[in-house]
A protein has these predicted regions:
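A short beta-loop-alpha structural element at the N-terminal edge
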Residues: 1-17
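Active-site rim helix/loop that mediates acceptor-substrate recognition in acyltransferases
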Residues: 26-53
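Short hydrophobic/aromatic beta-strand or adjacent loop that forms the aromatic wall/cage
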Residues: 47, 140-146
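Conserved beta-strand in the GNAT
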Residues: 51, 57-67, 78, 83
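Active-site beta-strand termini and strand-to-loop segments that position acidic
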Residues: 53-55, 148-149
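Conserved acetyl-CoA-binding loop-helix of GNAT-fold acetyltransferases
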Residues: 84, 90-103
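Conserved active-site alpha-helix within GNAT-family acetyltransferase domains
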Residues: 107, 111, 117-141
Length: 151
């Protein structure tokens, strides 16, 4: 059975999750480990990390952090590191994950989330709206930032 797991409630998965996100995005494993540990130990609303799991296999995941490496520090918090394993794509997993996280964050008192991406037409399916262009840290080109407000 496929389930969405809140890493805050499953600290035993922190090392595996940090390594998985590192393998998908190439950001140092220590950065993920530190953010996931903060999620588990700090009890603040941000950061948060989530995995989609089937038995012991990670099918996908994402995080919620203050800023996903862009110049608009006022647009916070940001969904980051959205990834679904290739063989599990086109099955609605990303949409379920996004909806779950938006609802979970609303329960924590956060109804507006932002997401930086160069994808077009994917996030719109899940009620995300293009807000503006932002400058990524160290990036030569501007990229899109989307907004989602949970009603």
């Amino acid at each position: 059975m496929i389930e969405i797991v809140k890493l805050r409630e499953h600290g035993e998965l922190s090392s595996i999750a940090a390594e998985w996100f590192h393998q998908k995005w190439g950001i140092p494993v220590e950065a993920y480990a530190e953010s996931i540990e903060e999620c588990i130990n700090n009890k603040k609303s941000v950061p948060q990390w989530y995995l989609v799991m089937e038995n012991d296999a990670i099918l996908g995941g994402l995080g919620v952090i203050e800023n996903d490496f862009h110049n608009r520090k006022d647009l916070t918090p940001n969904i980051c590191a959205v990834y679904v394993e290739e063989e599990y794509r086109c099955q609605g997993i990303a949409g379920k994950m996004l909806n779950f996280v938006c609802m979970d964050m609303k329960e924590k008192g956060i109804d507006t989330l932002y997401l930086v991406t160069d994808h077009t037409s994917f996030y719109e399916r899940y009620n995300w709206k293009l807000l503006c262009m932002v400058q990524g840290d160290g990036e030569p080109d501007m990229t899109r930032i989307y907004i989602h407000k949970e009603m």
